[in-house]
Design a protein with these regions (language model features):
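Short terminal alpha-helical segments
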Residues: 1-40
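Amphipathic alpha-helical elements of HEAT/ARM-like alpha-solenoid repeat scaffolds that form extended
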Residues: 2, 16-18, 51-64, 94-104
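Generic intrinsically disordered, low-complexity segments enriched for polar/acidic and small residues
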Residues: 3-6, 15, 22, 42, ...
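Non-membrane alpha-helical secondary structure
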Residues: 6-13, 23-27, 69, 73, ...
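Short, flexible helical or helix-coil boundary motifs
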Residues: 25-29, 42-45, 66, 84-88, ...
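Short amphipathic alpha-helical heptad-repeat segments
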Residues: 27-32, 74-77, 81
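Amphipathic alpha-helical interaction modules
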Residues: 29-71
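Amphipathic alpha-helical binding modules
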Residues: 77-129
Length: 129
């Protein structure tokens, strides 16, 4: 898995989760189905504490982005953030742990607020034929 930076979706896994949530939401899939499917795949994503951090932060961020962050996912993510960035970030880059922690702290604050401009589901165009 590629890690391109310390931001929430700067990894293949984070990007995959974000794209699945946003893509399915824009395609009109019901949010509860999206959440269920991603939570059902938790064991596949969360092989280590490092990947668990990426999984929960990407999921919470994605749901916040579409305006459908649930309290339980928010609370679990904030609890994980309070534990601090996983030490594996140091193996990626000596400065990454501190940088990631700043990103996580910013996300924790963001998750406590409602998204003022959530992504909208595009309206289906009427077929004129």
């Amino acid at each position: 898995m590629a890690i391109d930076g310390v931001k929430i979706i700067d990894s293949d896994q984070g990007y995959d989760i974000y794209n699945e949530v946003v893509g399915r939401y824009r395609d009109g899939d019901h949010v509860s189905n999206i959440i269920k499917d991603i939570l059902d795949a938790e064991k596949d994503y969360c092989q280590t504490d490092f990947f668990t951090e990426i999984y929960w932060t990407a999921l919470a961020y994605s749901l916040w982005k579409i305006g459908h962050l649930t309290d339980d996912i928010r609370d679990k993510t904030v609890e994980l953030i309070q534990k601090g960035a996983d030490p594996f970030w140091m193996e990626i880059d000596p400065k990454a742990l501190k940088q990631r922690q700043k990103v996580l702290e910013k996300l924790a604050v963001q998750l406590q607020t409602e998204n003022p401009r959530p992504l909208k589901v595009p309206k289906a165009k009427a077929n004129t034929q």
